[in-house]
Regions:
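Cysteine/selenocysteine-centered motifs that mediate thiol-based redox chemistry or coordinate metal-sulfur cofactors
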Residues: 190-216, 356-389
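C-terminal catalytic lobe of FAD-dependent flavoproteins
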Residues: 260-362
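Long, contiguous, secondary-structure-rich segments that constitute the structural scaffold
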Residues: 1-37, 41-42, 115-131, 135-302
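Immediate flanking context of iron-sulfur cluster ligation sites
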Residues: 368-378, 400-417
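Local cysteine-cluster metal-coordination motifs and their immediate loop/turn environment
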Residues: 378-390, 411-428
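Long, low-complexity segments enriched in small/aliphatic residues
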Residues: 6-115
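Cys/His-clustered metal-coordination modules, chiefly Zn-binding fingers
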Residues: 396, 412, 431
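Short, glycine-/Ser/Thr-/acidic-enriched flexible segments
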Residues: 76-78, 85-87, 103-107, 135-137, ...
Length: 437
């Protein structure tokens, strides 16, 4: 306010004493509108979710908007606007034979300025990736996890490929959230690579003003880099966001880079641990000083760190272990050069599995672990930390119709009973389990 020239004699533009007072102002701004929530209170929302609209005097929200048949027009009647069919702005052709669509992730919101600061919300989808039909991948000799270049008439980005039968042939999908804060790199000309919207068209609907982000013509090609980096580290809660920001500032020094948070599995309301995952690649190893900076930010520069280095071959490995009374856990690691051990070492770290028997074998890590590692389980319900395996196991004891089995499942595990965003996936798993029975 001082920067805007406000004097002490003028009223404050931010007269808020609590988060509730901010919310109360927002609530009042909805009065009389189709999203009227003036019947809600902050205390009610603290206890449980509420459905809008819920105007003042209502005891519960409406199940359907405009259910009484009155619409926000001058005469209260709905208006239908005839809109002629318009083809997509950009058609596929030989140079760009695939249709790129973008959209939301279940647990993230738009630019992730808020959700992107919570490691637990990366539990459902852990890192940026391009989703492709398995047959389209096979035709291009692309395997899951391979880095690919996605090109459109406007630019190009790099990302790992991920097989998905939910994506149709000739189509690819990338979540709209993966901007340059999480997915970046450096082009051959030295320019910083942007996120997914580097690829999309600038065309928008003349009526609704919605951008045409659901269809862009692209080409996808496997990209083979000679050098790779993979690093994960648990970090102190009071510094993890600051260290992630510092790592993000280094992303443009690599030809490909992604940087995201992760967290320990916890139930909503509990405080878990948080960490950062950095992945990078290039045709040549980067400067040693850059890798030293990454080591420092991931707290891999202390005396308690096991190290191996072969600068001539571009190989570096660093491992930080934590001793507990009855076991040892992997707290951080960095693989530079040969990163084939990423998957099982990541599981070892994220799941806090005992690591005391691995010792220095972690520095000679290859594609196969020297000792068995329990596979990581996929999180379905982020709010209540319910895994796919827990759902499958519980469903074996459920009986009745799909709705009855769903109710039994929720009575036991409570999955899908908080925010509800995972409910479609849970219902799908109930149907699939019933079909397989």
């Amino acid at each position: 306010e001082t920067a805007w020239g406000r004097t002490p004699a003028q009223p404050s533009l931010f007269p808020y004493t609590s988060p509730e007072s901010i919310w109360n102002e927002h609530r009042e701004s909805t009065r009389g509108r189709d999203l009227d929530i003036t019947g809600m209170s902050y205390a009610q929302l603290e206890r449980s979710p509420l459905q809008w609209p819920m105007p003042e005097g209502a005891v519960q929200g409406k199940v359907r908007l405009f259910e009484e048949g009155v619409f926000p027009t001058e005469n209260g009647r709905a208006r239908f606007v005839p809109t002629p069919y318009r083809p997509v702005a950009e058609t596929r052709d030989a140079p760009y034979p695939l249709a790129l669509s973008t959209g939301r992730l279940r647990d993230q919101w738009h630019g992730m300025s808020r959700t992107g600061t919570l490691g637990r919300l990366f539990g459902h989808v852990q890192e940026p990736a391009l989703h492709m039909h398995p047959q389209d991948m096979a035709r291009r000799r692309i395997k899951a996890g391979d880095l690919v270049q996605i090109s459109s008439r406007r630019g190009a980005i790099l990302a790992p490929a991920q097989a998905s039968a939910e994506v149709g042939l000739g189509q690819v999908f990338m979540p709209m959230h993966w901007g340059e804060e999480f997915l970046s790199g450096r082009s051959s000309s030295g320019a910083r690579l942007g996120g997914v919207n580097t690829l999309t068209t600038p065309v928008f609907c003349p009526d609704a003003k919605q951008p045409e982000l659901k269809h862009s013509a692209v080409q996808v090609q496997r990209t083979d880099f000679a050098w790779h980096l993979s690093a994960l580290a648990w970090l102190p809660a009071d510094t993890v966001l600051r260290q992630r920001t510092a790592l993000q500032a280094l992303m443009a020094h690599f030809e490909f880079a992604s940087c995201v948070l992760f967290s320990s599995p916890t139930v909503l309301g509990q405080t878990g641990r948080s960490g950062v995952m950095l992945r990078a690649a290039g045709q040549q190893p980067p400067a040693e000083a850059l890798l030293d900076e990454v080591h420092t930010l991931l707290q891999l520069d202390g005396n308690d760190v096991l190290r191996y280095a072969d600068p001539k071959q571009g190989q570096r490995r660093a491992v930080r272990l934590q001793r507990h009374p009855d076991h040892t856990t992997l707290e951080a690691f960095l693989l530079s050069g040969d990163t084939r051990a990423h998957d099982w070492m990541s599981t070892l770290l994220r799941e806090a599995q005992p690591a005391q028997d691995y010792g220095r074998a972690l520095l000679a890590a290859g594609v196969a672990p020297p000792l068995p590692v329990r596979p990581a389980d996929h999180t379905v319900c982020t709010c209540l930390n319910v895994s796919e395996q827990a759902i499958q196991t519980t469903l074996t004891g459920c009986l009745g119709s799909p709705s009855e089995r769903l109710q039994q499942l929720q009575n036991t595990l409570r999955c899908g009973t908080n925010c509800g965003s995972c409910l479609p996936e849970i219902k799908r798993r109930v149907r699939l389990h019933l079909q397989a029975a």
